[in-house]
């Protein structure tokens, strides 16, 4: 590496938009890569070996373009960031109702979720198509009851089995550009139920006549495709599901997102009169004296609780509850040239985690089913650098050999200094 290249590397190393290279060392030259990967007495950390593999692949397959791997590495700093979903609540209605323990009135013929669910989505691929769905997840595995101004666990066991998740309801297919420009408006999403333990007895399906069964099946199937089936006296939270539609029409999960302030209890009639007033006052379909009265009740309540409401600062950013991605990471694991696909069992790593603490967190000679790996390109997911491999399905492409983590760690530092 000549002096000019060293200067270029140093400048790139210190650009704000380029994170530190692996373990804080500058990116090696192709010649140093060659020594690292094939030298008899040197074993680089295997995350560095992933970089070696990536850049060897680059030099073998990339025709023309960048003159050195530093420019190639820098391109990753400009990749889309982690997908974020933010709940839109311009009137603070979700915040206020969450403080009061929100309630959602449910009828057999369906009711729209209110307040409306509106989301802002950032960092999608503008040229990709996305499939958007929604479901409701139960917050607790038991029914609840309202008593003495608060909700508590219901002592009576339900006679029917209540699913912990509803079926998904299709919202639509959109381009990433449209979603990011206009957001996602889910104001038409409805919830329904098919009776309650506290209501008049419903004829069991087994006791219906054939004609009644056909009618029931027809109506039920229509509801299930357009509405979310819930049970009364349960606490639910909406979960937004975004899948990228790949060129082969397969789906890649981007994330399943929820915000805690959108949870609600399903009821056949409102229990808290303040909740009812706030919802009635804000609902554009409400009319007449009932709405005027609700507006006055809402004003009085907000006035008497002004300082409290101003102190409430709930996060509008949705968290990911995806089963194929960690709650703090919204992307599938990055795959590098020539590597196996890692599994989705992540453990988060903070940007402040040092090399010593990171490296000592796993045993490089371990033969256990799961091996920890460090993301060789931190700019792709700076906050979430650890992932694990499941040896039953895949394995790390390269691994260091050492007698102990401590010895390997010291040897790596010494030998990297030698080559750098």
Curated annotation (Swiss-Prot):
It comes from the Eukaryota. SMART domains: TBOX. It is found in: Nucleus. The keyword Transferase does not apply. One of its GO terms (biological process) is cell fate specification. This is Putative T-box protein 33. Residues 395-412 have a biased composition (Polar residues). Pfam families: T-box. Its main location: nucleus. InterPro entries: p53-like_TF_DNA-bd_sf (IPR008967), T-box_DNA-bd (IPR046360), T-box_sf (IPR036960), TF_T-box (IPR001699), TF_T-box_CS (IPR018186). Gene3D superfamilies: Transcription factor, T-box (2.60.40.820). GO terms for cellular component: chromatin; nucleus. Residues 93-291 bind DNA. Transmembrane segments: none annotated. It comes from Caenorhabditis elegans. GO terms for molecular function: DNA-binding transcription factor activity, RNA polymerase II-specific; RNA polymerase II cis-regulatory region sequence-specific DNA binding. Keywords: DNA-binding, Nucleus, Transcription, Transcription regulation. The keyword Hydrolase does not apply. Residues 395-420 are annotated as: Disordered.
């Amino acid at each position: 590496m000549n002096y000019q290249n060293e200067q270029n590397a140093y400048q790139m190393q210190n650009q704000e938009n380029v994170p530190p290279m692996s373990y804080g060392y500058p990116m090696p030259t192709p010649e140093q890569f060659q020594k690292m990967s094939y030298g008899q007495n040197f074993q680089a950390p295997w995350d560095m070996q992933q970089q070696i593999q990536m850049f060897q692949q680059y030099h073998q397959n990339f025709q023309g373009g960048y003159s050195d791997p530093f420019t190639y590495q820098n391109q990753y700093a400009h990749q889309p960031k982690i997908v974020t979903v933010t709940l839109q609540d311009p009137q603070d209605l979700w915040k206020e109702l969450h403080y009061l323990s929100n309630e959602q009135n449910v009828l057999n013929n369906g009711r729209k979720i209110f307040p409306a669910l509106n989301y802002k989505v950032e960092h999608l691929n503008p040229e990709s198509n996305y499939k958007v769905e929604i479901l409701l997840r139960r917050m607790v595995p038991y029914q609840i009851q309202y008593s003495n101004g608060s909700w508590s666990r219901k002592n009576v066991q339900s006679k029917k089995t209540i699913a912990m998740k509803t079926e998904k309801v299709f919202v639509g297919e959109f381009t990433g550009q449209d979603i990011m420009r206009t957001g996602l408006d889910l104001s038409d999403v409805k919830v329904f139920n098919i009776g309650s333990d506290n209501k008049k007895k419903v004829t069991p399906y087994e006791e219906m006549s054939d004609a009644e069964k056909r009618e029931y099946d027809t109506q039920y199937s229509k509801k299930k495709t357009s509405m979310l089936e819930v049970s009364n006296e349960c606490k639910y939270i909406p979960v937004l599901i975004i899948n990228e539609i790949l060129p082969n029409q397969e789906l890649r999960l981007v994330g399943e997102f929820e915000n805690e302030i959108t949870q609600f209890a399903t009821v056949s009639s409102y229990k808290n009169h303040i909740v009812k007033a706030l919802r009635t006052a804000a609902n554009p379909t409400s009319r007449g004296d009932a709405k005027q009265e609700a507006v006055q009740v809402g004003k009085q309540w907000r006035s008497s609780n002004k300082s409290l409401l101003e102190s409430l600062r709930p996060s509008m950013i949705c968290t990911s509850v995806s089963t194929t991605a960690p709650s703090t990471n919204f992307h599938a694991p990055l795959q590098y040239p020539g590597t196996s696909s890692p599994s989705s069992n992540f453990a988060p790593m903070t940007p402040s985690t040092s090399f010593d603490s990171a490296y000592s967190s796993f045993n490089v000679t371990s033969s256990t089913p799961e091996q920890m790996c460090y993301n060789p390109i931190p700019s792709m997911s700076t906050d979430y650098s650890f992932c694990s491999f499941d040896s039953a399905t895949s394995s790390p492409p390269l691994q260091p050999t050492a007698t102990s983590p401590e010895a390997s760690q010291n040897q790596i530092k010494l030998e990297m200094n030698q080559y750098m």
